[in-house]
Amino acid sequence: MLIKPQHNETDYIHFVYRNLTGLGIVLHTVYAVMMGMLQFAIPCFYNICSVLFYIGMLLLVTKRKKYAAAVSLIHLETICFVSTHTILFGWNSAFFLFLVGMASLVYFCPYRKTYIPYVFSLLHILAFFLLHLNVQDPILPADGAVLLNILFICNSIGAFVIILYVAYVSRASAIIGKEALIKQNEDLLQIADYDQLTGLYNRSCMKKRISQCDSSHSFLAMGDIDDFKLINDTYG
């Protein structure tokens, strides 16, 4: 099982896409071998190029830290992969399932502008309907029931792996977000309870603590701050 890194949510999004890049390498390697065994030269060559592409993306995110560029290219490559193979093998080959899987992953995009993930989601949806309306019959001789069943099973497994991975990382991301909020809340409470100049409890904190005390078993002692005059003269 994948273990979430102990970092903030942005680091976790980067972690998600590093794993997704590795998944892309494995997936396209399987397709390249399968297409080679079935003697389909064009899709075999395409998937070999895709393996090299994902290796390049892995280097881009690990060495150059260009996560936004890598994520954009990965989503565009997915659309290109699905479109090419749907045109070659027909709609019934079910390559469109990858569009469904990737559309659910766009909300882990490392972009500063919040609308960009929705743009990629719309591109996946648009590609889905355009392929459905315009592509039915395959270009390659792939209309045999056995071959279509093999492609359907492989594509279904690949798409469900992506969807299950999204479900897992969504849960882990929610945990990270919750931990970050708790830490932020603790920091804010600490800032609210202490005077920023003296480092001592401020009036509101003292009033809150006094209200929590049992009046019959509590004592209040008041003292002066030795360097209060220095603080007052320095900061006003």
Residue ranges of each PLM-predicted region?
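Membrane-embedded alpha-helical segments of multi-pass membrane proteins
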Residues: 48-53, 95-102, 154-158
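Juxtamembrane or sensor-core-proximal signal-transducing alpha helices
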Residues: 157-185
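N-terminal juxtamembrane segment and adjoining first transmembrane helix
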Residues: 1-70, 169
